[in-house]
């Protein structure tokens, strides 16, 4: 049953152990130039990627709001009307359009200022649940996402984290490993949408069926000036820099519709030719793929237990645990808590940084405009950068406790942090233009002790779940 309630103002004080919890907020949008973490303080980085939520939709946390987090309780539609955000379940059955076209609809770019006016969310295509209107103007029932609130209140919450791209999951996951969705090195084009695969195949990368295509967008923001291409790209990724430097990595993702396949929209390496390698029985089977891509997302829990965590890990959920509107069963907060608790309760806690983020805004209302919408220019990213806000939590013994970061971040910031941590060169894409999260850390502070995150479902639930993994969205 879908619960519906209009959000009203909330005043709350959180008391922990008899002491008032005070969150510190920091403003500003300049790119940080401070140095990377001291050698050895961070030896492992884990990037947990959830799906399709905006900050206003997912983080109506009264504690964060009271502390100054930039979270709105209402929005403006294309008619100039104020719409109060309405409460809905995390697993509510609707899935707004989140294509590049949907970005343009919600953005309503001003020809005068070159900024999004953020008054077009009502123009996004969506089929709302029966009896509900304006479902794009909604927020998730806080009781269903309390693990996220607990983590964000304890460590660092970034309220100005933006997806780098202006579109859906497949290109977003390319930016999360490469800082680009360009088809080749040096190209000024970007893959801008989820691929059109033949017959609805789950494989949307280099192992997609013949005839599959993905749209390209040019520096003018035009998706029709270039013919669509097969969704298989060739350029450097962060994994190449790691391997060249002798660093280890793994990419954990559930298998797809059939044994041996993967949910391609959500798996960055599948669309990179030199990682996918040879195609065997319609599936990537190259040496890089076989060595580093693990088609079982819960294997990260086992690897932590067995002291086999790699230096850099990406963690992709099943559809049910993804938070993706219309696909999730609401178990996402427990899934994330399981991974965080596994690390926190292990020896890895002492030298690990965990980033929890969401791959795109999901077509859901958010009131903060992107920092720049680059069109008709010679600057990197022109035509497809930047997208809307997505949540981000930074978890580490060296993360600032109870801190709200209002510095501008994007997916390139994650790459840049990893580059600095392991003394890697820059890829020269989104990472080159990004900050490195240095405002979120204090490497001179006494390391924070880990505080276990309460959640409705424990790690055993996910380890023992024998249901076939659900596939990603195909829109």
Could you say what each language-model-derived stretch is?
Residues 26-475:
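N-terminal pro-sequences and low-complexity stem/linker regions of secreted or lumenal proteins
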Residues 10-23:
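Bacterial N-terminal signal peptides
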Residues 4-6, 22-30:
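Short, low-complexity disordered leader/linker segments with a strong preference
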Residues 1-11:
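Bacterial N-terminal signal peptides that target proteins for export
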């Amino acid at each position: 049953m879908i619960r519906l309630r209009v959000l009203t103002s909330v005043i709350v004080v959180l008391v922990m152990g008899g002491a008032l919890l005070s969150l510190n907020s920091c403003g500003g949008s300049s790119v940080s130039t401070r140095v990377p973490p001291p050698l050895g303080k961070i030896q492992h980085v884990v990037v947990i990627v959830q799906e399709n939520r905006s900050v206003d939709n997912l983080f109506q946390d009264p504690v964060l709001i009271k502390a100054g987090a930039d979270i709105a309780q209402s929005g403006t539609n294309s008619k100039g009307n104020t719409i109060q955000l309405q409460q809905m379940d995390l697993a509510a059955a609707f899935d707004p359009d989140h294509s590049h076209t949907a970005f343009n609809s919600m953005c309503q770019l001003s020809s005068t200022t070159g900024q999004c006016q953020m008054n077009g969310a009502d123009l996004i295509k969506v089929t709302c649940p029966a009896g509900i209107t304006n479902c794009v103007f909604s927020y998730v029932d806080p009781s269903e996402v309390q693990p996220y609130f607990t983590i964000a209140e304890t460590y660092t919450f970034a309220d100005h984290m933006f997806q780098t791209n202006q579109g859906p999951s497949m290109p977003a996951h390319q930016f999360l490993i490469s800082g680009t969705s360009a088809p080749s090195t040096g190209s000024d084009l970007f893959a801008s949408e989820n691929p059109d695969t033949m017959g609805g195949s789950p494989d949307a990368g280099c192992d997609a069926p013949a005839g599959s295509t993905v749209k390209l967008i040019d520096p003018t923001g035009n998706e029709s000036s270039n013919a669509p291409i097969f969704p298989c790209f060739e350029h450097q990724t962060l994994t190449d820099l790691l391997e060249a430097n002798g660093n280890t990595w793994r990419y954990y993702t559930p298998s797809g519709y059939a044994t041996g396949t993967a949910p391609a929209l959500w798996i960055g390496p599948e669309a990179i030719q030199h990682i996918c390698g040879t195609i065997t029985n319609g599936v990537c089977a190259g040496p890089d793929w076989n060595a580093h891509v693990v088609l079982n997302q819960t294997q990260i829990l086992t690897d932590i237990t067995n002291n086999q965590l790699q230096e850099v890990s990406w963690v992709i959920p099943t559809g049910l645990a993804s938070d993706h509107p219309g696909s999730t069963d609401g178990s996402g907060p427990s899934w994330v808590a399981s991974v965080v608790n596994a690390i926190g309760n292990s020896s890895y806690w002492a030298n690990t940084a965990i980033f929890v983020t969401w791959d795109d805004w999901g077509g859901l209302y958010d009131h903060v405009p992107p920092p720049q919408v680059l069109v008709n220019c010679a600057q990197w990213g022109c035509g497809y950068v930047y997208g809307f806000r997505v949540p981000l939590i930074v978890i580490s013994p060296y993360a600032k406790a109870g801190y709200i970061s209002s510095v501008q971040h994007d997916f390139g910031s994650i790459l840049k942090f990893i580059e600095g941590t392991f003394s890697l060169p820059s890829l020269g894409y989104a990472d080159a233009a990004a900050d490195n999260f240095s405002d979120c850390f204090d490497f001179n502070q006494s390391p924070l002790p880990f505080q276990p995150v309460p959640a409705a479902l424990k790690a055993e639930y996910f380890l023992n779940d024998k249901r076939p993994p659900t596939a990603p969205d195909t829109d």
